[in-house]
Amino acid sequence: MKTLILAAGLGKRMNSKYPKVIHKIFNKPMINWVIETAKNFGKVAVVLGHKYELVKKVIPEDVEIYLQNQQLGTAHAVMSAIEFVSPNDNLLILYGDVPFISHETLKRLEKEHVKSNSDVTILTSILENPTGYGRIVRDGKIRIIEDKDATEEVKKIKEINTGIYIIKGNFLIENINKIENNNTQKEYYLTDILKFTDNISTVTTNDVDEITGVNNRIQLANLEKKIRRKINEKLMNQGVRIIDPNAVYIDPQVKIGRDTLIYPFTFIEGETEIGEDCVIGPLTRIKESKIGNKVTINRSEVEKSVIEDNVSVGPFARLREGTTLDENVKIGNFVETKKSSIGKNSKAQHLTYLGDATIGNNVNIGAGTITCNYDGQTKHPTYIEDNAFIGSNNSLVAPVKIGKNAITAAGSTITNNVPENSLAIARQKQINKENWVLRKGGQKNANNKK
């Protein structure tokens, strides 16, 4: 089965300079959610129109693109891509602004289409308030009557047309050009193709959210809120403790182990995996990261990092791309890491920057330590081997290596390698000038200024 995604609309109600279908839901353009689902069934094509150059940038290379130069209705959009369809194909019609249509529902639709050998199979739904939707009328044959054309009796029908169809390729090719624009909008509607056949079947979905389209920013926010609630409830049913599901933001592809506790105002995004018995949050953001078991992350930001078991992070830490923390590592308040690996049982608990650093096991990084990794043109590495002790307020000027069991004294600026089992002191000798303040009258003058 092939899929054609219609995404040429103007999206005026979004009141945006960007096309509607590239607005993001869960940090991904909404059209990409549709494309990913459609790829489960075979080849995919999209019909673009309004500002297509911007939409084209987010379309995968293996998806064919067709242009609808004028937006003259859904049937006209399909006409624009008719060469994508062969007579032996079944064509699934989807929409770029209906992002959460599920694979399971489309699989049922495909199964019914093949089983019934219908010319057209329609996905329908039941709405308590169907106002605005075309109604499915069953009076010996299946028809769609638009809301504006419906009698009071027809308006009582709650089964609606979602606009999602599977159509036989040969039937579509033979009849698409027969559709006329005899309506007030002077547009060509794909629903009119049903006039040319009685061989129609239907499948109904009870999940209204999966067939909900996005027309404005309020609908975008409301739909995302509903989907987030479902995501959180699914995780809770799988054994995750979420204290306040209304204040936790988790993307659909995130995986979280049992007995992990999520505090409010936590954002977990992208292809993130979190193990069991973790404590995450509050006020924490984790993106595209892999986290082991029994990890605590408190009021911190983690991006594209790997954290092994029994690690503690935060509060107010930032793990940037390329960070790897081995088992039992402790990263404390106001510590930042980037492209660095930190070995087992090592600690950096206060006011530290570690960039392009490789740190061994059982290393202690003193408060105020900085790896000076950038010379204005090039990044340089720092190596700290097992059991080293880095004193407080150290500047490690890369490239530099601290050997096993070595110690650097507090306040040092380390510019050369430190051998194993050595103590490095790189600071000026302290000089105390006795009674200097009294001789200069400094203290008296200072007091007079108060």
Curated annotation (Swiss-Prot):
Cofactor note: Binds 1 Mg(2+) ion per subunit.
One GO term describing the cellular component: cytoplasm
Region span, Pyrophosphorylase: 1-217
Binding site for UDP-N-acetyl-alpha-D-glucosamine: 6-9, 20, 68, 73-74, 95-97, 134, 146, 161, 215, 320, 338, 353, 364
GO biological processes: cell morphogenesis; cell wall organization; lipid A biosynthetic process; peptidoglycan biosynthetic process; regulation of cell shape; UDP-N-acetylglucosamine biosynthetic process
Pathway: Nucleotide-sugar biosynthesis; UDP-N-acetyl-alpha-D-glucosamine biosynthesis; N-acetyl-alpha-D-glucosamine 1-phosphate from alpha-D-glucosamine 6-phosphate (route II): step 2/2; Nucleotide-sugar biosynthesis; UDP-N-acetyl-alpha-D-glucosamine biosynthesis; UDP-N-acetyl-alpha-D-glucosamine from N-acetyl-alpha-D-glucosamine 1-phosphate: step 1/1; Bacterial outer membrane biogenesis; LPS lipid A biosynthesis
Binding site for Mg(2+): D97, N215
Subcellular locations according to the entry: Cytoplasm
InterPro entries cross-referenced by the UniProt entry: Bifunctional_GlmU (IPR005882), GlmU-like (IPR050065), GlmU_C_LbH (IPR038009), Hexapep (IPR001451), MobA-like_NTP_Trfase (IPR025877), Nucleotide-diphossugar_trans (IPR029044), Trimer_LpxA-like_sf (IPR011004)
Needed co-factor(s): Mg(2+)
HAMAP family from the UniProt entry: GlmU
PANTHER family: BIFUNCTIONAL PROTEIN GLMU, NUCLEOTIDYL TRANSFERASE
Enzyme class: transferase
NCBIfam families with a match to the protein in the record: glmU, PRK14354.1, PRK14357.1
Source organism phylogeny: Bacteria, Thermotogati, Thermotogota, Thermotogae, Thermotogales
EC number of this enzyme: 2.7.7.23, 2.3.1.157
Chief location: cytoplasm
Any one Gene Ontology molecular-function term assigned to this protein's record: UDP-N-acetylglucosamine diphosphorylase activity
Catalytic activity: alpha-D-glucosamine 1-phosphate + acetyl-CoA = N-acetyl-alpha-D-glucosamine 1-phosphate + CoA + H(+); N-acetyl-alpha-D-glucosamine 1-phosphate + UTP + H(+) = UDP-N-acetyl-alpha-D-glucosamine + diphosphate
Keyword Metal-binding tagged: yes
Region called Linker, residue ranges: 218-238
Name of encoding gene: glmU
Family statement drawn from the similarity comment of this UniProt entry: In the N-terminal section; belongs to the N-acetylglucosamine-1-phosphate uridyltransferase family. In the C-terminal section; belongs to the transferase hexapeptide repeat family.
Name of protein: Bifunctional protein GlmU
